[in-house]
A protein has these predicted regions:
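Short active-site-adjacent structural elements
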Residues: 125, 171-174, 188-191
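Short, low-complexity, polybasic intrinsically disordered segments
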Residues: 132-136, 175-182
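Short, flexible loop segments at boundaries between secondary-structure elements
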Residues: 177-200
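A polyanion-binding, active-site-adjacent surface
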Residues: 2-161, 169-171
Length: 200
């Protein structure tokens, strides 16, 4: 399994992306953060999966782990001692969506960390503004689908245990049939998102 995860991450790093997208996995630290997260999950057998839209520039764009900013990574996954990399441990990056998602995960109080991924695993941004987020286009989502399918296969997550966080993720998961939808926490969706995760 470790070899499959290694190959998966190497494939991410080798993906050629467009001029309005950042391949965050060109960075060795983000690759290692993702590897540590996926290996920890494999050992602890996740019981459900959350699929979002794409990495945000304050969250996954910094850590390499979906729905996870540096603050949540330190609080719930590991510290530098465990091998996780932080750009500045004295001033941790925070993202609203990451805080909401992790808050709901902890509120479930089941001791389980879900497998988390995105419809498109690279960071799409607006023209002339790298520190921004952009909805992935159709071509990008086609690229993203192969990574999503591979990760689902690696972890053998049953269809009924996969949840779409947001409409982009719901559309991307359409090939599986009807998938449970959870509202994305951005743009006023916090309460509905939390309720959705708690109801899993």
């Amino acid at each position: 399994m470790e070899e499959r995860i290694k190959i998966f991450i190497e494939r991410l790093a080798s993906e050629q992306v467009g001029s309005l997208t950042e391949n965050i996995y060109l960075d060795k630290h983000k690759r290692e953060n993702l590897r540590l997260y996926l290996m920890a999950l494999y050992k602890n057998k996740p019981t459900y999966m959350l699929v979002g839209e794409a990495p945000g520039y304050k969250g996954c764009g910094v850590t390499g782990i979906p729905f996870t900013d540096e603050n949540e990574m330190k609080n719930h996954l590991g510290t530098e001692r465990e091998g996780y990399y932080f750009e500045n441990i004295q001033c941790l990056q925070k993202e609203n969506s990451a805080g909401i998602i992790w808050g709901a995960i902890q509120a479930r109080n089941d001791g389980k960390i879900p497998l988390m991924w995105n419809a498109y695993p690279f960071h799409p941004f607006k023209e002339n503004k790298r520190s921004s987020n952009r909805k992935p286009n159709k071509t990008e989502l086609i690229v993203g689908k192969s990574y999503l399918e591979e990760l689902i296969d690696i972890f053998k997550i049953p269809k009924n245990d996969i949840y779409a966080v947001g409409r982009v993720a719901q559309s991307q998961l359409g090939y599986l049939g009807t998938i449970d939808y959870i509202r994305h926490p951005s743009y006023g969706g916090k309460t509905e998102c939390v309720i959705g995760i708690l109801s899993i």
